[in-house]
Amino acid sequence: GCQRWSLDGLVQEVGRAWDLGIRCVVLFPKVADGLKTEDGAECFNEGGLIPRAIRRLKEVHPGMAIMTDVALDPYSCDGHDGIVSDEGVVLNDETVVLLCKQAVAQARAGADLIGPSDMMDGRVGAIREALDEEGFEHVGIISYTAKYASAYYGPFREALDSAPRAAAG
């Protein structure tokens, strides 16, 4: 099922997972509507929800591997994975820059694995380069290719409350 927890609740739930032998968790944010913008800039706020959650989990459960989601849809007011122009076109290259900033912010907080779930061209190579430039060669990048064709995609969008809205025009 789909669950949302406060930071304290997350720490407790991850502790229960650890006790069951689970050694990796994936974090997805439910961003407050007031923090969502057209460019999704909250995604790379190092004081934001996901970096705070990572740091807290690493303090309390240092052996737990933490995977994070990299995409703009939880942070954008239109629910899209990328920055959208006034003409309704997703701006690939501009979006990739933000995804790199997001991945680096998550790595700085202690993420072990980065999972780009957006659909921007060239983002994996760009994220790898950005992580390496910041000294995070050890942070892995994992693929999401199977999720979109699975029963997990609907609940994922529901959990994030980020179904994309139609472009204007």
Language model features: what each stretch is:
Residues 1-169:
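Alpha/beta enzyme core
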